[in-house]
């Protein structure tokens, strides 16, 4: 029963997100809030409630749900998505140090998640750590691009991603 209602709420939220339908997103959020009240110790419900708030642009309201889900033992893909969501939310709220801490944890625990790395790069930019921000962006670009012109210069770009301030004299 509980998992069926949770699946229904997630499906509603995903439909609302895909269609950018605020009414459907609000319906999903309402259902998730009911589930969160009935099952306050369920990490997955708590996490999905955070996402529903984020999808509606209710970022400040999403943060406590993300934090609670993380302390409730969230794991696997949900943990990965929660770290990404919370880090991105903190960044959007201008809470750059919390964003950096959260996203660095995400990079440590999920090193192959390039989205987390790019959100970390944006956060580092906001913190005026331009060198590390550019290194992350350029490294991710060069490791994922199929653009033949970029591939032609891959060696040089990859080198300079780590040596941005170096000149030839």
Q: What do these predicted regions represent?
A:
Residues 71, 125-148, 158, 162:
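TPR/TPR-like (Sel1-like) alpha-helical repeat modules
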Residues 40, 74-77, 111, 145:
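Short coil turns that delineate tetratricopeptide repeat
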Residues 5-8, 12, 46, 83, ...:
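TPR repeat positional signature
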